[in-house]
């Protein structure tokens, strides 16, 4: 589905919808009673959801071997369409042995609640070390993405999926805006250019600065924080969402910002994930995407601007969405403003660099981040959350 009047078509031209109608859902529930059941972990559940709502268009299910190999080797699907990360369903060899290609498999959560169905078209083994090297550029088990990969099952199941019903998000139902809805909102507001911003951290002054720089040249900002699985030391989603609400209320032009949750899981795949994040935002209807310093990175596995350079490996028309590449922003003590090296006359020692890590360290010590780091309302919320949890963020 693509609607005329949309600012940009979905990736591949059609917005995928794999959510069953109420009538279909009833039939599928009956069918599922006679199917083998597979219990999905948090990442697989969020992947199922993202496929079903069209966030991963053109994917209609979990990848087969041909697409998987092609994505690993070329960052394109087998049909030539740009795609940078494998979206796969791993299971143990024991579970896979009991499943036959051509079967329908019931997909359930850890508690056994039926979520959807998979039409199993293929099952295949894969090389974990090779996938780690290709996707994450490292085989180090300390890398959170590699760690997940090494711990998961050794067989991938492939095939189209159907989600039985779209449930409201348990924590943020008001911010659950799926691609068809975000596109509708952009049309209603008359936005022709929309910039997407991906985050898994509270928004500090550096993020605010680059978002507002982007807002100077586009019609609207789609603030799209990730609320799927993240590292255990990332700040909890409910705290982050409260920070975003306060910021938009006090410091942004509200009519030019839409806040929505992104239910995807974080891979920490750095450059490849930056492309992936851009394509997902294209499906939500964004024409532009902010790529900052060390986008989707972790530790020191990637260079600070590797996630920007990777966009140069694709022709602009292959991606369709325009990356807005920003340098690391800081508070310039010479001009008394936020800036980057492109706009500041300061020397390195006259710059206050901001990072989520620094803020977490300050909070751990019981300190309130200064206004050069964070807006006071955000700093207060983070400090309160730290006290309530009584443990490091």
From Swiss-Prot:
List UniProt keywords, sorted A-Z: ATP-binding, Nucleotide-binding, Nucleotidyltransferase, Transferase
| One Pfam family in the UniProt entry | PUA_2
Please name the pathway: Sulfur metabolism; hydrogen sulfide biosynthesis; sulfite from sulfate: step 1/3
* Enzyme Commission numbers on file: 2.7.7.4
In this entry, which stretches build a coiled coil?
A: none
Q: Which InterPro entries match?
A: ATP-Sase_PUA-like_dom, PUA-like_sf, Rossmann-like_a/b/a_fold, SO4_adenylyltransferase_pro, Sulfurylase_cat_dom, Sulphate_adenylyltransferase
One biological process term from GO is: hydrogen sulfide biosynthetic process
The UniProt GO MF terms for this protein read: ATP binding; sulfate adenylyltransferase (ATP) activity
Q: List the disulfide bonds.
A: none
Query: Can you state which reaction this protein catalyses?
Result: sulfate + ATP + H(+) = adenosine 5'-phosphosulfate + diphosphate
Q: Which NCBIfam families match?
A: PRK04149.1, sopT
Q: Which family does it belong to?
A: Belongs to the sulfate adenylyltransferase family.
Q: Which PANTHER family match?
A: PTHR43509, SULFATE ADENYLYLTRANSFERASE
What is the designated name of this protein?
Answer: Sulfate adenylyltransferase
Classification from the root reads: Bacteria, Bacillati, Cyanobacteriota, Cyanophyceae, Synechococcales
* Gene that this sequence comes from: sat
């Amino acid at each position: 589905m693509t609607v005329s009047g949309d600012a940009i078509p979905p990736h591949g031209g059609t917005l995928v919808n794999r959510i069953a109608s109420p009538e279909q859902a009833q039939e599928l529930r009956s069918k599922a009673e006679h199917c083998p059941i597979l219990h999905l972990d948090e990442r697989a559940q969020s992947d199922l959801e993202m496929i079903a709502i069209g966030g991963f268009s053109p994917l209609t299910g979990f990848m087969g071997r041909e697409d998987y190999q092609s994505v690993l080797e070329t960052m394109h699907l087998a049909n030539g369409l740009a795609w940078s990360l494998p979206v796969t369903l791993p299971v143990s060899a024991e579970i896979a042995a009991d499943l036959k290609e051509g079967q329908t498999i019931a997909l359930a959560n850890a508690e056994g609640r039926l979520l959807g169905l998979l039409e199993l078209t293929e099952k295949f083994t894969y090389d974990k070390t090779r996938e780690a090297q290709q996707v994450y550029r490292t085989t180090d088990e300390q890398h959170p993405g590699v760690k997940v990969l090494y711990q998961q099952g050794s067989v991938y199941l492939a095939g189209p999926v159907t989600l039985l019903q779209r449930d409201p998000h348990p924590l943020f139902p008001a911010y659950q805006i799926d691609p068809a809805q975000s596109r509708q909102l952009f049309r209603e507001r008359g936005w022709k250019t929309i910039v997407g911003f991906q985050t898994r951290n509270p928004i500090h002054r550096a993020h605010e600065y680059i978002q507002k720089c982007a807002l100077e040249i586009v019609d609207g900002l789609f603030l799209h924080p990730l609320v799927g699985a993240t590292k255990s030391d990332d700040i909890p989603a409910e705290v982050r969402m409260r920070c975003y609400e306060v910021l938009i209320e006090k410091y942004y032009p509200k009519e030019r910002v839409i806040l929505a949750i992104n239910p995807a899981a974080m891979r920490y795949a750095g450059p490849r994930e930056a492309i992936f994040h851009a394509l997902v935002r294209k499906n939500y209807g964004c024409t532009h995407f902010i790529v900052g310093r060390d986008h989707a990175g972790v530790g020191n596995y990637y260079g600070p601007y590797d996630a920007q350079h990777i966009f140069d490996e694709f022709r602009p028309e292959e991606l369709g969405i325009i990356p807005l590449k920003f340098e690391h922003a800081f508070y310039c003590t010479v001009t008394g403003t936020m800036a980057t090296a492109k706009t500041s006359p300061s020397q390195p020692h006259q710059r206050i660099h901001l990072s989520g890590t620094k803020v977490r360290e300050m909070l751990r010590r019981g300190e309130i981040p200064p206004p050069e780091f964070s807006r006071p309302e955000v700093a207060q919320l983070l400090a309160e959350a730290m006290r309530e949890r009584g443990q490091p963020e």
